[in-house]
């Protein structure tokens, strides 16, 4: 998640050596929360599962949600590798629509037995700040728990919105591990400025 007013507020300036130091926090939820997401206070919403989305459509979602936060892992994948993930029946993509247009997405990964990973979750920058984030997260948590796993996991890092970890904790996640690593700044990679092939 990010802020429409200052979308790059937490992103460090490029370093001369082309690297970034990132602290990753891993969180888990070992019991389903009580209650339900209910209705959002924002009107004209729909959440639809996209079965086997095209690579172009997925990249549109991933890049639009993730670019302000330097999401790069899926961006760096070749199309055939990404397509294999998207075509896996245990990877579920849900798109949030507002007034008929994409507003964000959720990716739930069921590939590990008895565990669900909230692999990706976020809103388009223009949809942030109106109360959609916590509601969509609660919806994602309820959907993940419906399969009866032992735990639900997610991770966030200090490139994300500064309130991201607070939102996860309020939803019921608890940190269980943290690590700091050095990565190549994705802004220096050829794929970063490469336009996606095709169109959504």
Each model region followed by its residue ranges:
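Acyl-donor-binding surface of acyltransferase catalytic domains
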Residues: 1-51
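Conserved GNAT acetyl-CoA-binding A-motif
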Residues: 144-156
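Conserved beta-strand-loop-alpha-helix junction that forms the acyl-donor binding cleft
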Residues: 128, 154-164, 181-187, 191-192
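Short acidic/polar active-site loop segments enriched in Thr and Asp
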Residues: 92, 150, 174
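Short amphipathic alpha-helix that is part of the acyltransferase structural core
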Residues: 39-74, 194-195, 200
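Conserved active-site alpha-helix within GNAT-family acetyltransferase domains
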Residues: 5-13, 159-178, 185
């Amino acid at each position: 998640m990010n802020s429409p007013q200052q979308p790059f507020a937490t992103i460090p300036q490029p370093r001369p050596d082309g690297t970034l130091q990132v602290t990753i926090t891993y969180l888990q939820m070992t019991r389903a929360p009580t209650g339900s997401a209910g209705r959002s206070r924002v009107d004209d919403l729909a959440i639809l599962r996209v079965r086997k989305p095209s690579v172009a459509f997925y990249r549109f979602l991933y890049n639009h949600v993730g670019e302000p936060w330097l999401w790069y892992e899926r961006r760096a994948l070749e199309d055939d590798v990404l397509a294999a993930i998207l075509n896996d029946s245990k990877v579920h993509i849900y798109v949030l629509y507002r007034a008929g247009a994409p507003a964000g997405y959720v990716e739930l990964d069921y590939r590990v037995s008895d565990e669900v990973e909230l692999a990706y979750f976020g809103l388009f920058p223009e949809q942030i700040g109106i109360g959609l984030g916590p509601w969509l997260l609660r919806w994602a948590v309820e959907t993940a728990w419906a399969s009866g796993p032992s735990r639900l996991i997610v991770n966030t890092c200090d490139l994300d919105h500064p309130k991201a970890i607070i939102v996860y904790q309020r939803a019921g996640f608890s940190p269980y591990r943290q690590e700091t690593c050095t990565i190549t700044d994705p802004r220096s990679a050829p794929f970063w400025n490469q336009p996606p092939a095709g169109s959504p």
